[in-house]
Amino acid sequence: MNNFDDILEQPAEQEAPAQENPKRKLEWWQIKEQKQRKEAYATLDRIFHEFSEGKGDVQGYLDTHGRFDRYSARNALLIHEKCPNAKQIGNYKYWESQGVDILKTEKNNPIIILEPGNTYRRKDGTTGQNYYAKEVYDISQTTAQGQEQPKVALDERLLLKALIYKSPAAIHVVEQLPDGRRGALYQPEQNSIFVEKGMDAADIFRCVSQELAKAQLMAVNPEQLPAECGNKAFCVSYMLCKKYGIDTR
């Protein structure tokens, strides 16, 4: 057993647009926000259409979402569309608090994301969520450009332990997977993930993260088959690898 196998053997709807009162005269900033919000939704509609036709930059989006995993998928799409190489974003007040200024040439070129606002009652009695447009800027649009945050070296054992913490399926290390498979395999009938013995940390992270994603997706929707959530699981694994510096090869 190598230095990593023992770790694995441990118990282990588009929202409705914000409702405006047509009788109320809007201020200039409200008109601006309304325009930005409509443009953001139009951008998302275009991106979704491109994805549906197999023309969108899916890998680029996943790269961006891997860096901004705390943002919604929708906002990650908007960030990627406007600034695909974005590393660190914040609104005007955030950068001001950091002692950083927005470049004059970039002040009128913000990244627009959608933030939740007030809820409202629909005609059918259900509750809806309003969203408003928010201006943010990447560090490359500020006087702090080029001052990237240093990368933190992560301990491989701790990273693997974090990956399998509260796993939705039992994990077992085996000498060989069935049918000559390599890496890892989720078996829903046994609710177990079987992992090939002897892999290095990067290989373990890549294959186990994908099978963990399958297990979690099937826990949410038990009716689907492992093959039906394969693409989603791959995307989850890819983003995790990008986030933690694991080669996605």
Predicted regions and their residues:
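N-terminal accessory/interface modules of nucleic-acid-binding and processing proteins
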Residues: 1-249
